[in-house]
Amino acid sequence: MKNVTTRRTALKTGLAATAAAVVPMDGAAAAPAPKAPGETKIVVMMGHDGMHNDVSYEMEIRSIFASKKDWRIWAARTNKVISPELIADADLIITQRFGDPYEWNAEGLADSVGSQRFSLYNDVMAPAMIANVRDRGMGWLAVHNTIWNGRKDLEDFIGVDAELHQEIQPVIYKQFNPEHPVTRGIEPFCVNLEEQFGVKIKNPAETTILFRSLAVHDHRDSVGGWCLERGKGRVIGLLPGHLEWCYRVEAYREVFWRAAFWAMRREIEPFPKSGNRDLW
């Protein structure tokens, strides 16, 4: 019985492997290892507040790109390690955080007195994110509540005005753009519990709609994904993402996979099917 895999041992193994790959927490802006020749650097900044589990998001995102052994993912579990230096040589950033300051990480003690709060979209990071996309060609996947960054410059850059979700409910994603390589051939799918954020496109002439969403209970129909060119770089907005389980929907995993390649201006490789991913 010593070698039998249980839910507990599987969780321990998975969490240990994920923790080993994370940016160190011991400094105000701890620097990752230098980018190796030929390596693809992806910086992931997801969850990180009282309602979203960033470690669970991180594990799902890592699993989508697990077959790409030369793609190195740096997942920031605390805003205090995020700096312009961290993304200065990144090929892609993936964000799923709103603009309010919040502080949480997977290590150490949680102190109710004197805790510091940091915002991802501060006056240093926001211009750096824009410049790296526009001037250097870094890709940006702006996921879910990234639209609530609270900054006019970032809202203009990703090309949308945010609309708040209503009831958390099943949401159908549909009308996938058959002309775009990120969504060509993708069939409609449903996420059983989702915040159906919406957006208003600021400049339709420069924006491509990738797909739409339909709320099952209140029937609100809205844009669910879009993309646009920004200087040397590209931005893709993907609104599904309230709970980590949406990243187990095979169709959305494929959209995410394709979006990463497209945002980095790379030829999109065939998506490796995931098979049975049920940890339980």
Locations of regions flagged by a protein language model:
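Extracellular ligand-binding/catalytic regions of CAZymes and related secreted enzymes
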Residues: P37-T40, S67, R77, H217, ...
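An acidic, glycine-rich "communication" segment
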Residues: E58, A142-H219, P272-W280
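Solvent-exposed loop/turn segments at secondary-structure junctions
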Residues: D49-M51, K80-V81, G99-Y102, T146-G150, ...
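Aromatic-Pro/Gly-enriched surface loop or interdomain linker
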Residues: A31-L92, S274-W280
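Short, surface-exposed beta-strand/loop micro-motifs that present aromatic residues
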Residues: G198, R220-E229
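N-terminal secretory signal peptides and thylakoid transit peptides that target proteins
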Residues: M1-T18
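Short alpha-beta junction capping motif
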Residues: M45-M46, I87-G150, K232
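C-terminal segment of classical bacterial N-terminal signal peptides
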Residues: V23-G27
